Amino acid sequence: MAQKLWEKSVQVNKDIERFTVGRDREMDLYLAKHDVLGSMAHITMLESIGLLTADELKQLLAALKDIYAQAEKGEFVIEDGVEDVHSQVELMLTRRLGDVGKKIHSGRSRNDQVLLDLKLFTRAQIKEIAEAVEQLFHVLICQSERYKDVLMPGYTHLQIAMPSSFGLWFGAYAESLVDDMLFLQAAFKMCNRNPLGSAAGYGSSFPLNRTMTTRLLGFDSLNYNVVYAQMGRGKMERNVAFALATIAGTLSKLAYDACLFNSQNFGFVKLPDDCTTGSSIMPHKKNPDVFELTRAKCNKIQSLPQQIMMIANNLPSGYFRDLQIIKEVFLPAFDELKDCLQMTTYIMNEIKVNEHILDDDRYSLIFSVEEVNRLAREGMPFRDAYKKVGLDIEAGRFTPCKEVHHTHEGSIGNLCNDAISALMQQVVDGFHFEGMEQAERALLGR
């Protein structure tokens, strides 16, 4: 059985070990590639300050590239008796290279090592989320343009209110994603700062070159203060979780709208048949299960910031084992959100729109405001026009003109989709993912 990195002469209690390790071995598989990348940057820096020879660095880099390839192919495993990904990588290096493998931990603690792994993992996941959001955004904008002239009822208080359009409906969710991406960009900028070299949270007596590892890993800058670098554990995850939650909130609302509008009582849209399921007893049913699950999963993601906040709440400065539990709720959340984005993008691309909703007389009253405004344009005071139309409705004399003339920015006749698309492009361009990608390719020699 592999020896623990911290093991001394005290016998390990197996029940205590099971309790303290928890799900770390499972969760750390998310971090394997990133742990290897961090080690490659760290040992390159160690060689530059004389703690490794050039030949030792060459051996270690070759071995780490092999381990990275295993992780990339999903073949990396954390063996029984090994606590975490850091221990497994060091064990593999030591088996292959002997004492040289034992040198990689100089000037480093598992505290800053896991901080680094989490940041490398998170920024890579943010890139994938951003790309998925952008794909959904483009589908929504295309559908908004396609159906810009198709009117639908607008609602307030779940009561029919005023004319809207499918152009507005699709476009509203597109613009919501722009704001969501601003949160994601802010989270990325906080995440893209290098904690490596903070060690256990108080630095090291080795002359570490933290600027060098920052450059090698493609970070924007450092977490300069070593105490704050450690204090940032939990805070970084919470801030990223807020960004994920804002995206999830948009998807949840869209899923609810689609389920509602797909129901027979509304009949505004038709979801793709392959995204519905049947009933075991009612042969006519086509249930919108994909969007119902999307709504539930997204609501779960919206609880993530509170979960993380409560786990890390009231901790003083320094490292505490409480923080380990955050990984269990944080790491899987990215895949869940990506799944929801993928499903929503597919459905929004395939959704069918009822182009004749307003032929139904039940929606005639949504044009009452249009009539009030027409009278006001002809010179009648607005309040008098409002009263006249109200009395006509009560007396059953109201006959609507089912035409709308909305021309101001963001209205039915002037969706401003080009401006919304420009806003999204501006946000996307502000991420600057190319820095981290170039750095990682350089480390791997690709």
Q: Language-model segments: what does each one mean?
A:
Residues M1-G203, L208-T214, S221, T277-G278, ...:
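A helix-coil-helix interface module used to build multimeric assemblies
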Residues A2-G38, D99-V100, G267, M282-R446:
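Glycine-rich cofactor/substrate-binding loops
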Residues H105, R110-Q113, H157-S164, L168, ...:
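Alpha-helix capping and helix-loop boundary segments enriched in small/acidic/polar residues
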Residues L217-P305:
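Acidic, glycine-rich loop-and-beta core segments that form the ion-binding/anion-interacting portion
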Residues K119, R123-A130, E134, I141, ...:
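Short amphipathic alpha-helical segments with heptad-repeat character
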Residues R146, F183-A186, M190, F219-V226, ...:
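Conserved helix-loop functional segments at active or binding sites
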Residues L60-L64, L217, D273-C275, V389-G396:
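A general structural motif at alpha-helix termini
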Residues H42, A63-Q70, M92, R96, ...:
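Generic, well-ordered alpha-helical scaffold segments in large soluble proteins
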